[in-house]
Amino acid sequence: AEITGLPSLGDDSGLEVESLDGAPGIFSARYAGKKGNDSLNNQKLLKEISLKKNRSAKFVSILSFLDPELKNPFFSYGELFGKIIDSPKGKGGFGYDPIFQVKNSNLTLAEISKTERMRISHRTMSTLKMITLLKESKIY
């Protein structure tokens, strides 16, 4: 916003595993290193959590919106709760989806439909909250 002079929207999302003190967190995409990929990230996470009893995890998305003509930014937050399973299941999605089992479900994100993934997504939640904030502000 400062550089372009235009309103800007930013997203920071990641996976937080309770027994790993919130890791991988903001490093989710680079968890296995700079040359890592989804498969290597999943392998590293599964290795680190292998001896842990608590496998609770959540996907988190935080959006920030700033209009350079306004003084205060808007922030919204979305979460999707679940747990990390022992091995990958499913072919859909990306990232940690094959090892993330959605709370109150027997399915991983990689096993559910794209439509359902989008409906329950942490990013969808934070986006809907942002839309509400902007509408309620009566600025947009």
Label every PLM stretch briefly:
Residues 1-140:
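Anionic-ligand binding patches
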